[in-house]
Amino acid sequence: MAQPSPSFPFLYRPMVVAALGAGLGIVFFRTLTGTGPLLALCLFSILGFACWIKGLLPLRTFCLAVVFALLRVALLPELSLPSSIMAPFVQAREALLHITGRLFPQQDGALLSAMLWGDKSQLDTSLRAAYQGAGVAHILALSGLHVSFVAMALNWLTRRVDIRLRLALTAMALFTYCAIAAFPASLLRATLMCLCPLSAQAMGKKKDQASSIAFAALCILFCAPSALWDIGFQLSFGAVIAIAMLAAPLTERLPFPRELSESISVSICGLLGTLPLSAYHFKELPLLSLFANLLILPLVPLAFLWSMTACFLGLLYYPLGDLMAPVGRLLLNGMNGAATAVAGFPLSLMEVPKPSLLSCFLFYGAMLVLSRFCLLPARKKALAAAGLFAAAFLLMV
């Protein structure tokens, strides 16, 4: 979509602007005291009406999103499915966790329970520390990585099916998976983002990655505004936003075969997108994350899909699942060994002082300026990004 005015320095995506406004509205409601939220509601209502009259579309959308977010948080409770609807999914989750534990030894079973079904309660502390130290803890959290494996399998199975039927089957399968995993924010985000391009294709529309990310955020925040404060929500969106902003141009500049360049650029951008949040929440940075991702990620889809298939077959007929399980154990041992080895390197995890929120926002602002969404000339983009990065790092010192 074209920008609404020559003076606006960014590509205008109504969904993105609405998501930013909604996020600010939720922050206002939580942080302002007394009559603060009411004053913010009145102020942004007036500003939104003024921008509407003046034809300032981005500002109008932003202000109205702030207003609707304030009203949403003030008037409605957080939404969740009734226990009567969730009961079958809870039973399915328990059955899958049980068969996972039967098919795989204790450590492997605990790892797969986290990777496949989102249950980290049995995960070994030392193994969790190894994945965190290697900078690949995202493998343990259900997210876009895992949805991409499921979607890839579904796409192959339904490759000869009409796109509308494929959309319906994929949506049903992915939302069932979300329900079994108890709707973690990162998995729900990935599911919605996966369905947006399919929906656009089914309707004959052009897909847009930025709008898909924003739509996923709006859906999650409408149902549960408190998700904005969830670390998993922040890390998930931080990574995918950075990938959307910088992965494509970085891929074009890397002198490697296309697939390798894409893997490297996605890993780099995912790392950049989570660096400020890792420093802010955990006061540490995984310095070897890029190397660990390139080493371990090729094993993950094989281990994930093979082990998931073994679990489903084990539910139907245990000997079949037991027959497949040894290959899954072998793949998991490779992942665990690689993560433990990388985490054992000196300085694999560096402790850093907690940055300020302003420093984090400046860091993300610099990435936004460097992205294709910023319409400034290349020289101005480079200077502005350098200034923002410098300010972000100076505030951390």
Model-derived features: positions:
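Short, Lys/Arg-rich, polar N-terminal cytosolic tail immediately upstream
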Residues: 1-9
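Hydrophobic alpha-helical transmembrane segments
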Residues: 10-16, 85-91, 109, 116-121, 181-186, 342-363, ...
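Alpha-helical transmembrane segments of multi-pass integral membrane proteins
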Residues: 243-347
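Membrane-interfacial loop-to-helix junctions in multi-pass transporters
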Residues: 105-109, 123-125, 162-169, 299
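Histidine-/acidic- and/or cysteine-rich, low-complexity loops and terminal segments associated
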Residues: 8, 79-126
